[in-house]
């Protein structure tokens, strides 16, 4: 970029040092420049009505201080720029004042009333243009001025401005207000127009060539005012010099606007994409809103419908329950009466039965006690008999032992006597120590024995001779006594036995008959024994009698049971049967009835089973249909939705498939039309893009070649031509319209051979790009084209092109046409794309419908089938209920028949007993016989043993053994005599044994020792025998004692048991019952039977009591249930009525608002209330979030939460629908249904997303193209600045010999341009980012390549927009050539006042000229604008400087209005002498106009 600056300086120097290049041809037509003709001030301070005619060059206002020069210039400036925000006349403003400066110096220059400042000008067309302002002071402290701008056209030249604005009233003139002025010209050719905006006023002045630039905004007016202000007060204005770029460099609105349009389009595109995303989210929110609101309301709607249906069903069920409770209550009351009657009967029977049971139980106890007593008696009898036997045995043993004791005692006594005798003999024998002594002792003993015998026997004459005789006599006598003793002993034994037998028999008789006299014992025993035989025979018959009685009692009991059963049967069967024939006939009848009932019941059961199977099948079908119904309703909703979307009525699945095929065909056709329109739109976009280029060229290589050759495209030189001239110039150059204008063809010729890539035909024209003229060809303009004479032999005819390459205005005009066409094509493309999207969506819906719902959508309505099934099921239920009642009756009949048959089965086997009337008598007779037999049996059992014992010894009772003591005494006496005789025999035997000893009378002395020894031996033997006898005695005594003790124990035990036996016999006699095994069994069976009957009665009574309690409780419950059922029914009925009112309101709302089909979602009818409430609650939670920002919907939703008013939910749904309807854009979406709108919105948003994405790709601009545009624009403006510098040549003010403009590219921006051109890949991250706009990316790149620069608080977008303006890339400075300093920067401090004023005026002229060039393409080609500048206080310029200004004005065809003191008199131009005078207390300015009164 430094090379560019150096090149610019070289070009500038060359231009200044070289002569100007002559144009290739002189223009054939010239346009005169417009001029300001006059300035008229009406009712200004000092000027009531004054017109200043303005010179074509310089108009000078000369006068002293206060003469009115500044007021005149203020009037001119006010008429030129009527903007109170800018006007500020400083030389009349109080210094340092704040409040008094509010009028900006204008208020004090006016007089009260209507004031005018009017400019009259003559434009290039020769039109008289009158523009001005009406001013009027506004009363108040603020010193405000009201300004109204206006214009007048077609005013004749003969009419002066003052005559137009005033009217003659007598000798005075009146200033016309604007309204009167307007009325004055109504209906005439004069066009009066009042402007309500300064922009319109300035647009009028620009169009007619009054001002050089179109002032579109307040910023443009500010620039213009600052330029006028700078020229007014003179000098180098720092405001202008600091912003020369804004004044001299055109804004290049086309490029900038293109960038801005591109950026705004991209931004709008992205914003639209974001808005689409937001809209999609809003759509999703709306979709969710409509979905959730539908779920919320429809779930509650269906729940209320279900609840209403359920409430009606509940009401019917409660009414049915009420009636059933009433019938149950009546039935239970009937049962209570029957059960109470039966309980009363059972209570009556229970007492008698209980008495019988107690009696039977007591009888059983007596029998059991009797049996126990009998067992004890038998046991005791056995024990007593055994004890008697033992006692007898013991008695015999005791007697034997007694005899043994006596024998042992006798033997012991004999042994003692013998020992004593032997001891005595021993003592005697011991006295003789020899045999003699012993014999003598024996002799003495023999003598002693003889004496003893004599003494014992009483035989004094006893001797050895008669001893044997006496011995024999006494032995015989002893034998007789022994026999007598034996006899007596036998008699005694017999007597003892007789006594024992008598005592025993007597005891037995006493035991049997009680205590009787001993003398009567025999008679009693005999009578007992006589009766005992019969009693034993009767006792043997007791068993048979007992068996017989048991049989009779059993039969009697069976007869009683049969009578009882018959009575019960007759009572239950309501009959009076008595005979067996009647019972058997009835039995056969009931058996046949049972078979019939069983057959009928089996048939009922079979029919019921069949009906239950049918009901089960129907239930299965119903459940299957109930499962299918929601899906079917969903399919129907989808089908209805699909029919609405397609606008078709589908009758079958084939029609859906056919429509789907047709939709595919339609989609292909729409796709082809869309693609065709897309290609047309792309072609138009390409043409628009080409025409949007600054040079209008469609070949990029031409720009590259122009830069390479240092030339300019011909189209750029004619870029500012007007719309009317553009076709002419395009046709004039023909194919050469793409030519490149270069300064020297020869210098370019050498480069042509080196070209690698260039167009097929490349046209080069030699000429100065800065002063190019169109007089190149000899041409003649025709109606439709131009005939160009290329040479004498070659003409070319070119028609006016419809789209001229030359002229930006023409291209822009055609661009408008192309854009309009593109918009139309884009709209058509959008419609076709919408149609394609719609077709695709419809095909998608169709595919989804076919895949999901086609199998169910055209099937029959499952609810109708469900209703039919429900009707069949109800009929079956009714039949089943009826069959259940019939079956219950049959079962009751069956149970009754079975019960009767069961009772008959019990009665019939006993029916023969009912006719046996003698059974009771026979039983009584048998019982009497059994009683006798049992008494005999009991007597035999009790006394049979005694009688058996008594029978063999009964004879002992004949005599009473009372002489037993005498016999015993005789026996003892005989025994004593026998003992004495035996002693005598023994003594005699001892004498006989000692008879030999009598012969020892001689040997008494010689046989003593032998005898002693013999005696000692005998004594020892005797002692041993005595010890043995004593031992035997002791043993016999011990045995006797033992036997006696045993006998005593047996006797006491026998007495005790006998006593116990007597007590048991008395007790069993007291019981009066004879027990046997059969009796116990009979008593027990009787007791058990009665117990069973009593238990049955009690259990039946307990059951009946429980049933009565249950029935009473059931009656109470049924009574409460009946009341509750009645109350619930009435409550439910009221609820149904209330719900019906609310439901009617809901239906009315939904039907009137056409939302019923949205709410009546039958697929929800099969869900439970909890599931529907869950759906509604979930939707409510989502809706609270969705409508949180919408107060109306939020309030409506809050009101809808009241469960008591379901209509509020419908109202909320209607509000949601209305809310969504209001937000449907009818220009885009052609429907009132929000759901359809959402569907269409999805299609449209999808299409817009695709379209905007592709548009963003088209709108994207490369950084390299931006750099090329900026470089090209900078180069063009540099060339223009060079051209402007030519107009400042030979300007001299004092020491200043030249003024020029220097334009340089800033280094930081040059680096940016290089980065844009060459760093494409390096900085790709910035320009390819979707988050950054191009301006922001450009600002980020600027910061990246210039990291040392602080951006401050400005945003990247602002910096980027500034970087898109080429003016920010350039630095403009004013340099002056002054003396020896050479070229230096123009500053007021380095110049004198005159030099500064001249230099500043030169700069201003350059600015005005630049504005004219900039606005040339916007102005008609036959108009050149007026040029006028001001200069107040020109006294600071010398005469030479003033002459220089005159020359400058003459050369640049410019007017100048200056104010000078009285001593300044320009040589040329018009001079007005202003003198302020006072006449008659009225102040006015006296004006005298002169022309060229200065020195020659």
From Swiss-Prot:
Instruction: Provide the residue positions that the database annotates as binding ATP.
Output: 63-70
- One cellular component term from this protein's GO annotations in UniProt: cytoplasm
| GO process annotations (BP) | cell division; chromosome condensation; chromosome segregation; DNA replication
Function (record text)? Plays a central role in chromosome condensation, segregation and cell cycle progression. Functions as a homodimer, which is essential for chromosome partition. Involved in negative DNA supercoiling in vivo, and by this means organize and compact chromosomes. May achieve or facilitate chromosome segregation by condensation DNA from both sides of a centrally located replisome during cell division.
Comment block on domains: The hinge domain, which separates the large intramolecular coiled coil regions, allows the homodimerization, forming a V-shaped homodimer.
Question: Into which family does the record put it?
Answer: Belongs to the SMC family. MukB subfamily.
Its assembly, as annotated, is: Homodimerization via its hinge domain. Binds to DNA via its C-terminal region. Interacts, and probably forms a ternary complex, with MukE and MukF via its C-terminal region. The complex formation is stimulated by calcium or magnesium. Interacts with tubulin-related protein FtsZ.
Name of the featured protein = Chromosome partition protein MukB
């Amino acid at each position: 970029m430094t090379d560019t600056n150096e090149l610019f300086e070289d070009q500038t120097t060359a231009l200044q040092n070289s002569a100007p290049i002559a144009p290739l041809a002189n223009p054939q037509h010239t346009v005169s420049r417009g001029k300001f003709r006059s300035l008229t001030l009406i009712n200004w301070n000092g000027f009531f009505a004054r017109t200043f005619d303005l010179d074509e060059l310089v108009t000078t206002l000369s006068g002293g201080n206060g003469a009115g020069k500044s007021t005149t210039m203020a009037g001119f400036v006010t008429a030129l720029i009527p903007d109170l925000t800018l006007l500020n006349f400083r030389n009349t403003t109080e210094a340092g004042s704040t409040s008094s400066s509010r009028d900006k110096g204008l208020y004090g220059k006016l007089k009260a009333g209507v004031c005018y400042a009017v400019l009259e000008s003559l434009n290039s067309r020769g039109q008289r243009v009158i523009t001005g302002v009406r001013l009027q002071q506004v009363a108040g402290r603020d010193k405000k001025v009201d300004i109204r701008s206006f214009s007048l056209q077609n005013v004749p030249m003969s009419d002066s401005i003052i005559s137009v604005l005033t009217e003659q009233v007598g000798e005075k003139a009146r200033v016309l207000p604007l309204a009167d002025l307007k009325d004055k010209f109504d209906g005439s050719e004069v066009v009066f127009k009042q402007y309500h905006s300064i922009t319109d006023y300035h647009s009028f002045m620009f169009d007619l060539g009054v001002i050089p630039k179109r002032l579109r905004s307040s910023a443009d007016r500010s620039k213009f005012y600052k330029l006028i202000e700078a020229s007014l007060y003179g000098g180098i204005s720092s405001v202008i010099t600091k912003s020369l770029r804004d004044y001299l460099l055109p804004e290049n609105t086309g490029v900038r606007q293109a960038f801005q349009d591109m950026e705004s389009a991209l931004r709008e595109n992205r914003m639209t994409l974001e808005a689409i995303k937001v809209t999609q989210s809003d759509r999703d929110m709306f979709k969710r809103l409509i979905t959730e609101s539908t779920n919320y309301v429809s779930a509650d709607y269906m729940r209320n419908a279900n609840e209403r249906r359920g409430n009606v069903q509940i009401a019917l069920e409660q009414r049915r329950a009420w009636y059933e409770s009433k019938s149950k209550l009546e039935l239970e009351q009937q049962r209570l009466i029957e059960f109470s009657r039966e309980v009363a009967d059972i209570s009556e029977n229970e007492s008698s039965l209980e008495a019988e049971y107690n009696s039977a139980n007591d009888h059983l106890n007596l029998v059991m006690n009797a049996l126990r007593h009998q067992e004890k008696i038998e046991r005791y009898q056995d024990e007593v008999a055994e004890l008697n036997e033992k006692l007898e045995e013991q008695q015999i043993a005791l007697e034997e032992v007694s005899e043994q004791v006596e024998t042992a005692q006798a033997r012991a006594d004999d042994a003692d006597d013998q020992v004593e005798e032997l001891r005595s003999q021993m003592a005697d024998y011991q006295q003789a120590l020899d045999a003699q002594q012993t014999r003598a002792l024996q002799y003495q003993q023999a003598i002693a024995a003889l004496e003893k015998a004599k003494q014992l026997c009483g035989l004094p004459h006893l001797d050895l001779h008669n001893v044997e005789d006496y011995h024999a006599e006494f032995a015989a006598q002893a034998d007789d006594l022994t026999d007598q003793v034996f006899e007596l002993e036998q008699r005694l034994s017999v007597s003892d036995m007789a006594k024992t037998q008598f005592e025993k028999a007597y005891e037995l008789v006493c035991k049997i008959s009680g205590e009787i006299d001993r003398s009567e014992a025999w008679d009693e025993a005999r009578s007992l024994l006589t009766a005992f035989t019969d009693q034993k025979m009767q006792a043997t018959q007791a068993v048979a009698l007992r068996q017989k009685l048991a049989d009779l009692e059993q039969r009697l009991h069976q007869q009683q049971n049969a009578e009882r059963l018959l009575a019960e049967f007759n009572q239950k069967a309501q009959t009076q049967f008595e005979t067996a024939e009647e019972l058997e006939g009835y039995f056969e009848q009931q058996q046949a009835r049972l078979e019939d009932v069983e057959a009928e019941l089996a048939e009922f059961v079979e029919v019921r089973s069949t009906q239950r199977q049918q009901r089960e099948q129907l239930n299965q079908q119903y459940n299957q249909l109930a499962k299918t119904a929601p899906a079917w309703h969903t399919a129907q909703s989808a089908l209805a939705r699909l029919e609405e979307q397609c606008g078709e009525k589908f009758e079958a699945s084939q029609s859906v498939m056919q429509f789907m095929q047709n939709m595919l065909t339609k989609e292909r056709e729409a796709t082809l039309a869309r693609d065709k329109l897309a290609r047309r739109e792309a072609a138009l976009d390409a043409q628009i893009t080409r025409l949007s280029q600054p040079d209008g060229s469609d070949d990029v290589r031409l720009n590259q070649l122009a830069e390479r050759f240092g030339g300019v495209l011909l189209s750029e030189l004619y870029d500012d031509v007007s719309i009317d001239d553009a076709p002419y110039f395009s046709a004039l150059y023909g194919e050469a319209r793409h030519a490149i204008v270069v300064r020297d063809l020869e210098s370019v010729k050498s480069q042509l051979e080196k070209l690698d890539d260039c167009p097929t035909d490349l046209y080069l024209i030699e000429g100065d790009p800065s002063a190019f003229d169109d007089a190149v060809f000899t041409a003649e303009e025709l109606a439709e084209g131009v005939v160009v004479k290329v040479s004498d032999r070659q003409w070319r005819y070119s028609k006016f092109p419809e789209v001229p390459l030359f002229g930006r205005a023409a291209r822009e005009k055609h661009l408008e046409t192309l854009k309009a066409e593109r918009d139309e094509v884009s709209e058509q493309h959008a419609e076709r794309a919408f149609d394609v999207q719609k077709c695709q969506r419809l095909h998608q819906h169709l595919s989804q419908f076919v895949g999901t719902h086609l199998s169910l959508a055209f099937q029959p309505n499952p609810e109708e089938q469900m209703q039919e099934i429900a009707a069949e099921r109800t009929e079956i239920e009714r039949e089943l209920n009826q069959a259940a009642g019939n079956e219950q009756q049959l079962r009751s009949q069956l149970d009754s028949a079975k019960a009767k048959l069961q009772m008959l089965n019990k009665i019939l086997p006993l029916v023969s007993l009912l006719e046996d009337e003698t059974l009771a008598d026979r039983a009584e007779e048998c019982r009497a016989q059994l009683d006798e037999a049992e008494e005999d049996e009991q007597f035999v059992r009790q006394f049979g043993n005694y009688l058996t014992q008594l029978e063999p010894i009964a004879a002992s009772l004949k005599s009473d053994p009372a002489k037993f003591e005498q016999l015993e005494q005789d026996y003892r006496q005989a025994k004593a005599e026998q003992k004495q005789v035996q002693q005598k025999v023994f003594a005699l035997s001892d004498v006989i044994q000692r008879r030999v000893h009598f012969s020892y009378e001689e040997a008494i002395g010689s046989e003593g020792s032998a005898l002693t020894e013999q005696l000692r031996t005998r004594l020892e033997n005797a002692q041993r025998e005595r010890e043995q006898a004593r031992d035997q005695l002791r043993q016999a005594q011990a045995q006797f004692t033992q036997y006696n003790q045993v006998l005593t124990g047996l006797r006491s035990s026998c007495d005790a048991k006998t006593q116990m036996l007597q007590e048991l016999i008395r007790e069993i006699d007291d019981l009066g019952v004879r027990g046997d095994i059969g009796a116990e069994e009979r008593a027990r069976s009787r007791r058990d039977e009665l117990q069973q009957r009593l238990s049955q009665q009690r259990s039946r009574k307990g059951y009946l009591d429980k049933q009565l309690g249950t029935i009473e409780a059931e009656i109470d419950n049924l009574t409460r249930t009946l009341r509750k059922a009645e109350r619930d029914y009435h409550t439910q009925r009221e609820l149904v009525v209330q719900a019906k009112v609310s439901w009617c309101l809901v239906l009315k709302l939904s039907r009137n608002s056409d939302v019923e089909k949205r709410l009546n979602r039958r697929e929800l009818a099969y869900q439970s209330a909890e599931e529907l409430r869950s759906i509604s609650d979930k939707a409510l939670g989502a809706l609270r979030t969705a409508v949180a920002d919408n107060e109306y919907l939020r309030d409506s939703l809050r009101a809808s939460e009241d469960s008591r008013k379901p209509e509020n939910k419908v109202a909320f749904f209607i509000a949601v629908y209305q809310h969504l309807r209001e937000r449907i854009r009818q220009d885009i979406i052609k429907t009132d249904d929000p759901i359809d709108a959402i569907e269409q919105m999805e299609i449209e948003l999808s299409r817009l997303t695709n379209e905007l994405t592709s548009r963003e790709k088209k709108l994207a601009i490369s950084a390299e193209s931006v750099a090329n545009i900026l470089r090209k624009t900078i180069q063009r403006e540099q060339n223009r600045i060079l051209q402007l510098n030519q107009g400042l040549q030979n300007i001299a003010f004092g020491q200043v010999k030249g003024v020029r403009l220097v334009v340089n590219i800033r280094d930081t921006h040059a680096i940016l341009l290089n980065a844009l051109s060459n760093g494409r890949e390096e900085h790709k991250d910035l320009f390819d980012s979707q988050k950054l706009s191009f301006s922001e990316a450009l600002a980020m790149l600027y910061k990246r390549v210039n990291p040392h620069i602080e951006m401050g608080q400005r945003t990247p977008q602002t910096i980027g927009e500034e970087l898109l303006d080429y003016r920010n890339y350039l630095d403009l400075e004013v340099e002056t050539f002054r003396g020896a300093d050479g070229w230096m920067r123009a500053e007021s401090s380095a110049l004198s006042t005159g030099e500064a004023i001249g230099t500043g005026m030169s700069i201003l002229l350059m600015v005005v000229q630049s504005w004219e060039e900039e606005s040339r393409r916007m102005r008609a080609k036959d108009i050149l604008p007026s040029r006028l500048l001001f200069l107040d206080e020109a006294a600071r310029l010398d005469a030479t400087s003033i002459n220089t200004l005159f020359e400058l004005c003459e050369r640049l065809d410019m007017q100048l209005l200056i104010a000078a003191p009285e001593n300044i008199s320009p040589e040329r131009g018009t001079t007005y002498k202003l003198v302020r005078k006072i006449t008659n207390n009225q102040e006015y300015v006296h004006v005298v106009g002169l022309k060229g009164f200065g020195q020659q």
